[in-house]
C-alpha cells in the first residue's frame, strides 16, 4: 500500500466514524421485515440502547457529543418477529431547545450564548443520553453527571 492509499483509507475511516454523529430527527416504530437467518421462537425480550440522537438544536451545533439529547432505541423480539422503536428522551433541556429552536442550557462541552460570565454559575444540563436501564418496573435514561430520567 502506498502512502496516498493509506491516507485515503484513514480519511474514509474518519468519514465513516463521523457519519455516526448525524442527527436523526424522526422517531420510528416498525416491524423489521428483512434480516438474515431465523429468529428463534423462544427468543423474547427487548434490547434498549441510548445515545445522542442529534448534535444540534435548530441551527446551533452542540460543542461535544456528550451534550446531544438522548434517544432511546428499543429492539424487541417476540414470537419470531423483530420490532424497532426509537424516541427522544423528553428532558426539560430537550423540550426547551425544541421549543425555542436553539441551545438554551449549558452542557458539558457547550456554552450558551452570552460569554463566560453568563455560563459561569449555570449547572451543566442533563441530556439523559448515556445509559438506559429497566429497574423497579420503570425504564430510566441516564447521564453520568446527573440524576436518572424516568421514561
Locate predicted features.
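Beta-propeller domains
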Residues: 1-151
Amino acid at each position: 500500500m502506498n502512502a496516498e492509499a493509506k491516507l485515503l483509507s484513514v480519511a474514509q475511516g474518519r468519514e465513516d466514524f463521523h457519519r455516526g454523529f448525524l442527527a436523526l430527527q424522526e422517531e420510528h416504530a416498525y416491524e423489521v421485515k428483512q434480516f438474515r437467518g431465523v429468529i428463534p421462537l423462544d427468543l423474547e425480550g427487548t434490547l434498549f440502547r441510548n445515545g445522542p440522537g442529534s448534535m444540534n438544536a435548530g441551527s446551533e451545533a452542540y460543542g461535544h457529543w456528550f451534550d446531544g439529547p438522548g434517544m432511546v432505541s428499543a429492539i424487541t423480539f417476540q414470537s419470531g418477529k423483530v420490532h424497532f422503536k426509537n424516541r427522544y428522551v423528553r428532558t426539560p433541556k430537550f423540550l426547551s431547545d425544541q421549543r425555542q429552536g436553539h441551545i438554551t442550557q449549558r452542557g458539558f462541552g457547550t456554552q450558551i450564548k452570552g460569554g463566560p460570565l453568563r455560563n459561569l454559575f449555570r449547572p451543566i444540563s442533563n441530556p439523559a443520553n448515556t445509559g438506559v436501564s429497566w429497574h423497579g418496573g420503570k425504564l430510566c435514561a441516564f447521564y453520568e453527571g446527573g440524576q436518572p430520567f424516568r421514561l
